[in-house]
A protein has these predicted regions:
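A detector for small-residue-rich transmembrane helices and their helix-helix packing motifs
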Residues: 1-253
């Protein structure tokens, strides 16, 4: 017999129970460190919008001119960093709040599966994918926000569930995806940004988890190649953004 915290247990009973050890990042309901850092960066950039650009609680004029994706400024002014800064700036506090709430909910679920480094790489790939989609569909528009990256997380979550044999209907993501599809088609947001991020999330989901429950991850058990593939994806998408931005003049006509 073995002494337990309450009474005693027989050896056969204790041998059947495997002890689970939870860490800060694997504790159910906990928020991963990378998710917290990304939320902090978004909040910091929003604060800078007030300090540097005199933005009001909902003003988007000066902020958009300085941070947002725009083909003319990226291509003609050489402001390539907009591909990245556009994913951290927001059009007002409501826009910021919606995206950060989504990141707070979705981020930890995926981060616990991928780990903080791979999760951050995937997030940035989806962010740049969103910039590519936005510039591809409308290179003259001023677009910004974390929505592209958030849609990338949705794509990753879809594939993560599929790898576990859980369909969209079973996972509860169906209504969420339909709602976001409706929002994307409403004309008030960047359809290209949402679609670009989501497609990147789906592709990375195949790399990390496999296409479905019967498929292995693209690189099997290799722990290095998926990260290299994600980094290459970011570079390719960034170059794609530069190309898409260069189309601004043709969009004028």
């Amino acid at each position: 017999m073995h002494q337990a915290s309450v009474g005693v247990h027989c050896p056969e009973c204790t041998s059947k129970t495997k002890q689970k050890v939870y860490t800060r990042n694997t504790l159910p309901g906990s928020s991963g460190i990378a998710t917290q850092v990304l939320i902090g960066l978004n909040l910091a950039v929003f604060l800078l919008q007030f300090v540097l650009f005199d933005a009001t609680i909902s003003d988007d004029g000066r902020t958009a001119q300085e941070l947002a994706d725009n083909g003319f400024f990226i291509s003609e002014e050489g402001e390539w960093w907009r591909v990245f800064t556009s994913g951290f700036g927001h059009f007002g506090i409501f826009h910021l709040g919606m995206n950060m709430y989504s990141l707070h909910i979705l981020g930890p679920i995926i981060e616990r599966r991928l780990g903080p480094i791979r999760f951050t790489l995937a997030y940035m790939a989806a962010l740049v994918g969103g910039s590519f989609g936005a510039l591809l569909l409308d290179p003259l528009a001023f677009t910004m926000g974390a929505s592209g990256a958030i849609f990338g997380l949705l794509g990753l979550l879809v594939m993560m569930f599929r790898s576990q044999g859980i369909g969209i209907a079973q996972s509860g993501l169906g209504p969420v995806l339909l709602l976001n599809l409706f929002i994307s088609l409403s004309g008030f947001v960047s359809l290209g940004g949402h679609a670009g991020g989501f497609i990147v999330g789906i592709i990375l989901g195949v790399v990390y988890f496999g296409a479905d429950a019967r498929s292995a991850p693209l690189f099997g058990r290799d722990q290095v190649k998926p990260d290299i593939a994600t980094a290459v994806c970011i570079v390719v998408l960034f170059l794609g953004c530069l190309w898409a931005a260069s189309r601004w003049l043709s969009a004028v006509g």
